[in-house]
Amino acid sequence: TQDASTGQIINRKFINDLPLTSRSVFNLAELSPGVTQAPGGSFGLNAGATNFVSNGGRNSTADIVMDGVSQTNQENNSGITTALYTPPVDAVEEFKVQQNTYSADIGFGGNTVINVVTKSGTNQFHGSAYEFLQNSALNSNNWFNNQNGVKKSPSKQNQFGGTAGGPIRKNKMFFFGDYQGTIARSTGTARAGVPSAAERTGNFGELCGAAGGTFDSTGRCSAAAGQLWDPMTSTYSSSAGGAVRSGYIPYDNLSTYTSPGNPNLAGTPYVLPSGPGNLIDPVALKMMQYFPLPNVAVGTASYNPLNNWIGTNGSRSTDNRFDTKVDYRLSDASQITARFSESRSNSEGVNCFGNIADPCTQGPNNSHSYSASVNYTRVFTPTLVMNITYGYARSYSFTHGVATDFPSFNPVTTLGLPQYILTSGFVATPNITFGNGYQAVSS
């Protein structure tokens, strides 16, 4: 039968012959007119790496169908297309992108629909084996590295697997199976601004020079961006419509400065400790000790306190996935097909700080995906065909956090945080962000 649906079909020959660097069949979608990768999205093996747009449609309304079963997570609240399972390239018989004027059996998605049909066994035994190697010796450097004179980062990826298919009972029952494993290692660099030895004691005088200023005889920086102010000395200004800063900290040195506090606060004013350094929070002081010391241009004229550290980061990941499929011909007019697919992935970034405060990784991540389908087809007449499909797909991912690598860490006894911080169930260092002149700390 024929219908008026439009799109592009990519058969087994093209799937096998076209180069796919990532070995993801969903990269083939970009061969269709009007299909592009969505901003911030990518095509790949992992769930969530199939974010694309087509002919101006919203990427969150696309659908991915495998052997008649939807593989799309519609409830992830992220506004993207998420493939719950991605089959290996060697397991795909046909890949079709449907973009307009859909047939009657398409009604789940509101945009482009990708249809994937997996391979089946035949009366002859067939098999294949492969391995693809990528590493820093064979791969070329990217354009941005070449432009900035940066050498290639060490990397290595091994992707291997095989397929097998044939008859279980000739002319009656057939099987097909495949497996693919991926082991990837990559290394890069991370740059940041970290507290210097002086700043760990409360002396932030480096900030004035970094802002292009100098201190006068009273210790005030000539560059406003390099001057620290005492928040306790803020006063209300009707012309400004709020509090304005009024008391600067001489030489940006908190360790020698004594804040007078603010007696003008309504109610009971917050009482500061007496003596120099009374603005230094003991928890923040302890947290600063978890940062590595500066290692870039230290002691030279080019030293920049806002970009004074470089370290190694990277990632390690493994992925294993397989498909099994059985076709059984009940008669010349009817057939039943069953398929089961599974993938397991593990990844972990390199801890570039070497402790629990590391910003380069969120800790180990484990992902697990299942996909299954049972399909019954009955041909009544050349123009009347019945197809019944039952499917199941599930994917979940869990990030353990950096704290799993440091089981003995206790933020209450180590940093001096309040006891209730342990009741959330996640033990880690607080997250600190800055914006609009205010500081927010959350666990």
Regions found by a protein language model. Give the residues of each.
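Short acidic-glycine motifs
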Residues: 1-443
